[in-house]
């Protein structure tokens, strides 16, 4: 049975000038926060902070959410991560995540030839092509990729991304134009083998 990952990525016109392409297009962005909703109820948030120093960009993130039903916590998730880019190329990534009672991690470094990432993760140890993107949702380049590195465990996730169209959203009496995408994992592992 395929694991279905469904995300709606919204690019509000408010951010379009700052969020327009590769990492260098994020130079004017210092802070990005989004709330996470399930069935129209806020369950958590994710915050990204951007620090620039010459040709380096460091992105730190902190996120958490809780899914409960009838007062029982079904999912309790918290994560912190740090990404370092030099000349618009990811050179380091590390994360620590607690998902219910499981501790997960990723330590990623680019190799000396800048062709591959060396990944040490809780679910994967090995190499990935340096053009593969870490699946942190601040970088809209993810919609152009056919695979991502899990920021939770380091595993390589094959994905299909479909553009569903433009939508106009009304938030606090203000209208925003958004792009709607559907992400689907095309990983054929049985659900109990996925980490």
What is the meaning of each model-derived region?
Residues 27-29, 96-188:
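Solvent-exposed helix/loop surface patches that form functional interfaces
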Residues 1-4:
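Positively charged n-region of N-terminal signal peptides that target proteins for export
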Residues 7-15:
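Bacterial N-terminal signal peptides
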Residues 33-35, 178-182, 195:
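Ordered hydrophobic segments in well-structured contexts
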Residues 189-195:
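Short, intrinsically disordered, charge-balanced linker/junction segments flanking boundaries
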Residues 28-112:
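N-terminal mature ectodomain segment of secretory-pathway/periplasmic proteins
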Residues 18-23:
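Boundary at the C-terminal end of the N-terminal hydrophobic targeting segment
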């Amino acid at each position: 049975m395929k694991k279905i990952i469904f995300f709606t990525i919204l690019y509000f016109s408010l951010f379009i000038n700052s969020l327009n392409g590769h990492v260098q297009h994020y130079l004017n962005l210092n802070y990005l926060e989004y709330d996470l909703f399930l069935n129209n109820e806020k369950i958590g948030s994710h915050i990204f902070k951007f620090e620039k120093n010459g040709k380096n960009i460091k992105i730190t993130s902190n996120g958490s959410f809780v899914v409960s039903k009838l007062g029982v916590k079904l999912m309790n998730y918290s994560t912190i991560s740090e990404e370092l880019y030099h000349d618009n190329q990811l050179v380091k990534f590390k994360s620590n995540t607690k998902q219910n009672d499981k501790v997960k991690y990723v330590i990623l470094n680019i190799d000396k030839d800048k062709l591959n990432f060396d990944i040490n993760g809780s679910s994967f140890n090995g190499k990935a092509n340096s053009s593969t993107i870490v699946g942190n949702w601040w970088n809209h380049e993810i919609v152009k990729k056919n695979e991502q590195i899990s920021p939770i465990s380091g595993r390589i996730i094959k994905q299909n991304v479909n553009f569903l169209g433009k939508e106009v959203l009304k938030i606090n009496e203000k209208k925003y134009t958004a792009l709607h995408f559907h992400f689907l994992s095309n990983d054929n592992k049985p659900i109990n083998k996925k980490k």
